[in-house]
């Protein structure tokens, strides 16, 4: 899989990231 952006706002805009991982409130995707 691809790496998710680590910044919360970037992750929020990234549909693939949102499908693949949970964006935690402190900004780390995991």
UniProtKB/Swiss-Prot annotation:
GO cellular component terms attached to this protein's record: extracellular region
Disulfide feature: 4-21, 11-23, 17-29
InterPro entries (UniProt xref): Prot_inh_squash (IPR000737), Proteinase_amylase_inhib_sf (IPR011052)
SUPFAM superfamilies recorded: Plant inhibitors of proteinases and amylases (SSF57027)
Keywords recorded for this protein, A-Z: Disulfide bond, Knottin, Protease inhibitor, Secreted, Serine protease inhibitor
Keyword Secreted included in the entry's annotation: yes
A Pfam match: Squash
Annotated compartments: Secreted
Site positions for Reactive bond: 6-7
Gene Ontology terms, MF aspect: serine-type endopeptidase inhibitor activity
Family classification: Belongs to the protease inhibitor I7 (squash-type serine protease inhibitor) family.
Domain remarks in the Swiss-Prot or TrEMBL record: The presence of a 'disulfide through disulfide knot' structurally defines this protein as a knottin.
Biological role: Inhibits trypsin.
Protein name in the entry: Trypsin inhibitor 1
Protein species of origin: Citrullus lanatus (Watermelon)
């Amino acid at each position: 899989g691809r790496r998710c952006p680590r910044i919360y706002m970037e992750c929020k805009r990234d549909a693939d990231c949102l499908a693949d991982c949970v964006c935690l409130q402190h900004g780390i995707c995991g």
